[in-house]
Amino acid sequence: MAAAAINAAAPPPPVAPTAPPPPPPPPLSQASGRLPSRVLELVFSYLDLPDLRSCGLVCKHWYRCLHGDENSEVWRSLCGRIVSEEALRTDILCNLPTYKAKMRAFQHGFSSSDCSRNVYIKKNGFTLHRNPIAQSTDGARTKIGFSEGRHAWEVWWEGPLGTVAVIGIATKRAPMQCQGYVALLGSDDQSWGWNLVDNNLLHNGEVNGSFPQCNNAPKYQIGERIRVILDMEDKTLAFERGYEFLGVAFRGLPKTCLYPAVSAVYGNTEVTLVYLGKPLDG
């Protein structure tokens, strides 16, 4: 009995100390920030554009890796997969110095689902071909419009102009086809256009004067690139020919989404449009 009581009162054996729990893993933003840029660039080069947009939001390191060099392997690889070989091989994109700029231009090309049924967008993604349909005026809008910022794009005809050839802008509501040979862009209050044939400015079915405002303005030459400048801050539309600023054609544009657009009447003519991005001042 006494021995049992003594044993019951004995202290418990010492417990070995337990190791502290491991520290939690670093947040994803910290871990990702340690990856070398060359490794990230290699991984990013296999991703599509929506995934790249998501990656750019992970951390500053990833964002800088994606957008620091517009000629990096990431954009070269994506450009090669999406932009047509013809567009990259010919001079269509000659005024775009980087792969990222070429990708951006492709995203802003003509919309094959938002154009007249009498035109189609060629495989290069930048050129509109009008079929030889009699008594029809046919147009097309780009895939992306603008409601803010400053934007520039180039347009040029690669075939005859016919009696009407108009470049300009349009809302989503503006029609892209009508009967007869007319200036479709500028035929209502939803579009603004410059007719390259007679140099008239058109809006709301009316002629708003000649353009450019000079004596004996030169006629448009086939293949000549016209630069269009849309300023949604000042609400103006202007044009350039070569390195010459021709002036502001329209003022007081509405605060709505406006799309680069063209309209044509000549059968088998072709029109190319290339988005350039933000215009360079001066």
Curated annotation (Swiss-Prot):
Give the gene name.
fbxo45
Residue span(s) of domain F-box: 29-78
What PANTHER family would the database entry show?
A: F-BOX_SPRY DOMAIN-CONTAINING PROTEIN 1, SPRY DOMAIN CONTAINING SOCS BOX PROTEIN
Recorded hits in Pfam families, A to Z, give: F-box-like (PF12937), SPRY (PF00622)
GO BP, one annotated term: protein ubiquitination
Comp. bias regions, Pro residues: 10-28
In this protein, which residues make up the domain named B30.2/SPRY? 88-280
Q: What is this protein called?
A: F-box/SPRY domain-containing protein 1
Q: Does the keyword Lipid metabolism apply?
A: no
Disordered: annotated span: 1-32
Q: Name the domain of life this protein comes from.
A: Eukaryota
Please report which protein family the annotation says this sequence is part of.
Belongs to the FBXO45/Fsn family.
Q: Summarize the subunit comment.
A: Probable component of a E3 ubiquitin ligase complex.
Which keywords does UniProt give here? Ubl conjugation pathway
What InterPro entries does this protein's entry cite?
B30.2/SPRY (IPR001870), B30.2/SPRY_sf (IPR043136), ConA-like_dom_sf (IPR013320), F-box-like_dom_sf (IPR036047), F-box_dom (IPR001810), FBXO45-Fsn/SPSB_families (IPR050672), SPRY_dom (IPR003877), SPRY_FBXO45 (IPR035784)
Pathway, per record: Protein modification; protein ubiquitination
